[in-house]
Amino acid sequence: MHGGNKYSSFYLINTISGRPSEKNLYLFNGDIVDKGCRSIECILLLFVYKLVYPFFVYVNRGNHESFQLNVRNGFRDEIIRKYGGENQFDDHFMFEYFGEIFRWMPIAHVINHKILVVHGGISGSTNLAVEDIRNKQ
């Protein structure tokens, strides 16, 4: 899911693919927020998926799960619009909490010990293998 109405896409994924399971793994590859007017609902739904199906749902952090893009592209504004008001500390803390969660999200996953999945990719001019990246951890 990238761009567009992700909230509706969750429904379609469940309808077409079924719920996450041992034989039906889900990998969401970043840019969960800043892509429509329901970013909060999308990321919270994704967190619920991860809690309910911890071994079957994986989430990579994309470049939109960063402070700079959250400010520039509207995620912070969405939080203020939906949760701001008389007590503006609420929206400030909510934005900070999401930022903290985003910083803990992994930037990559390895599938079957040989396929590296990252949101933005790796430069084509490099000759890296998954083992090379693993050795640098």
Q: Model-found features: residue ranges?
A:
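Feature recognizes metal-dependent phosphohydrolase scaffolds
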Residues: 1-137
